[in-house]
Amino acid sequence: MLLQGMRLSQRLHKRHLFASKILTWTTNPAHIRHLHDIRPPASNFNTQESAPIPESPANSPTRPQMAPKPNLKKKNRSLMYSIIGVSIVGLYFWFKSNSRKQKLPLSAQKVWKEAIWQESDKMDFNYKEALRRYIEALDECDRSHVDLLSDDYTRIELKIAEMYEKLNMLEEAQNLYQELLSRFFEALNVPGKVDESERGEVLRKDLRILIKSLEINKDIESGKRKLLQHLLLAQEEILSKSPELKEFFENRKKKLSMVKDINRDPNDDFKTFVSEENIKFDEQGYMILDLEKNSSAWEPFKEEFFTARDLYTAYCLSSKDIAAALSCKITSVEWMVMADMPPGQILLSQANLGSLFYLQAEKLEADLNQLEQKKSKESNQELDMGTYIKAVRFVRKNRDLCLERAQKCYDSVIAFAKRNRKIRFHVKDQLDPSIAQSIALSTYGMGVLSLHEGVLAKAEKLFKDSITMAKETEFNELLAEAEKELEKTTVLKAAKKEGLN
């Protein structure tokens, strides 16, 4: 208790020193995206009005008196004990389910409302004063010993981080995010700290805070380490509940042992995951989730889990580790099918996987060029021709393999769209634009492959098609790239035609 009191005193002192300096800052009300509320949507069950109890009809006959039964007191006593026992058990489970959802103390609620008012347009977005009030609200929570993992406590800390960002105090915001992440990570790793029924929600909050913190992160290697650390924690949680994921790892282990025995590439049996077996349709042709799949092991944090995996892929690309990005994406697509993710997201991930295979092929092409340059610089006596030939064959084989797999990924999305033509009619009705974007991206990807092979007329047509689709879906990033590649193709066609003449 003494140690707890000292920590609380230090925390309050630190905040008060900081709050006293806030009013001296200049305000920079730049627009920054608001944080999402980390709480699950509240149930409106308790707000429903109960129906009145109907009264007995006026002329209904009176019920005859029941004859008294022996040992009635004893039976009533037993019944009373049973009711008390059930009530105690019910109260215990109610307390456990609401332990992370405790309400703010009244003193903190008052300051919280004042802080919200200060950051509103009514007070000209006074973020400095709002920050001071949020810190004060957190102090009130500490004095009332509010659970540091509770939704309300975490929400106040996230609002403080948001104010830091709006005041361009990114280092302070990042430090607060790190403090939150450390607290959640420690709680999830200490046995009994988080109740089993609450682990999913706590993991969900942990991943959301992680994703938010990475929006202002500038250190790529640090970001990768954080992602890996928290993703492995979530993965272990899924593994403990999902027979499918256990089977996945067992099959991977068997495959690797077979590869060692017969000296094969572990990815020789690469297959795509876009098929009618994995993606279902309703009677009107709308893509739907497969309700027969049991994806409960991935709930309630599967959206956050796959967003974090995509971020890890992006960080790998930023650090030029294309092989790691590719490996992560292959696994992600397969797991998205297991987790019964929205069909459009599976399609888009498959198309993105094709792009990663093409990037890897480009890297291997650059490696081939380096080998050839090395050969031209060194004499035959200095160069070990046997080693050189082996290296060239290995790199060339892997490059061709990556190009082949990129085509498989793009082809699977386009062929799937052709086989299920109703997708085209419903593209504009879909709330999720990823379906149309995946088709546009795959069409563009096939154009890039055709350009790489020198089939200019086909490449030109595919680029034009992808531009049309990108405009329809407002896929501006793809639109810019497709227009650039179309211009390049047009120049090459003109040069080729001039050369023939």
From Swiss-Prot:
<keyword id="KW-0812">Transmembrane</keyword>
<comment type="function">
    <text>Component of the mitochondrial inner membrane i-AAA protease supercomplex, which degrades misfolded mitochondrial proteins. Together with MGR1, functions in an adapter complex that targets substrates to the i-AAA protease for degradation. Required for growth of cells lacking the mitochondrial genome.</text>
</comment>
<feature type="repeat" description="TPR 2">
    <location>
        <begin position="154"/>
        <end position="187"/>
    </location>
</feature>
<dbReference type="GO" id="GO:0045041">
    <property type="term" value="P:protein import into mitochondrial intermembrane space"/>
</dbReference>
<keyword id="KW-1133">Transmembrane helix</keyword>
<dbReference type="GO" id="GO:0141164">
    <property type="term" value="P:mitochondrial protein quality control"/>
</dbReference>
<dbReference type="GO" id="GO:0005743">
    <property type="term" value="C:mitochondrial inner membrane"/>
</dbReference>
<comment type="similarity">
    <text>Belongs to the MGR3 family.</text>
</comment>
<keyword id="KW-0999">Mitochondrion inner membrane</keyword>
<feature type="repeat" description="TPR 4">
    <location>
        <begin position="440"/>
        <end position="473"/>
    </location>
</feature>
<dbReference type="GO" id="GO:0006515">
    <property type="term" value="P:protein quality control for misfolded or incompletely synthesized proteins"/>
</dbReference>
<feature type="region of interest" description="Disordered">
    <location>
        <begin position="39"/>
        <end position="72"/>
    </location>
</feature>
<dbReference type="GO" id="GO:0005739">
    <property type="term" value="C:mitochondrion"/>
</dbReference>
<keyword id="KW-0496">Mitochondrion</keyword>
<feature type="repeat" description="TPR 3">
    <location>
        <begin position="386"/>
        <end position="420"/>
    </location>
</feature>
<keyword id="KW-0802">TPR repeat</keyword>
<dbReference type="InterPro" id="IPR040201">
    <property type="entry name" value="Mrg3-like"/>
</dbReference>
<dbReference type="GO" id="GO:0051787">
    <property type="term" value="F:misfolded protein binding"/>
</dbReference>
<protein>
    <recommendedName>
        <fullName>Mitochondrial inner membrane i-AAA protease supercomplex subunit MGR3</fullName>
    </recommendedName>
</protein>
<dbReference type="GO" id="GO:0031942">
    <property type="term" value="C:i-AAA complex"/>
</dbReference>
<comment type="subunit">
    <text>Component of the mitochondrial inner membrane i-AAA protease supercomplex composed of MGR1, MGR3 and YME1. With MGR1, forms a subcomplex that binds to YME1 and to substrates to facilitate proteolysis.</text>
</comment>
<keyword id="KW-0472">Membrane</keyword>
<feature type="topological domain" description="Mitochondrial matrix">
    <location>
        <begin position="1"/>
        <end position="77"/>
    </location>
</feature>
<feature type="transmembrane region" description="Helical">
    <location>
        <begin position="78"/>
        <end position="95"/>
    </location>
</feature>
<keyword id="KW-0677">Repeat</keyword>
<dbReference type="GO" id="GO:0030163">
    <property type="term" value="P:protein catabolic process"/>
</dbReference>
<feature type="topological domain" description="Mitochondrial intermembrane">
    <location>
        <begin position="96"/>
        <end position="501"/>
    </location>
</feature>
<feature type="repeat" description="TPR 1">
    <location>
        <begin position="109"/>
        <end position="144"/>
    </location>
</feature>
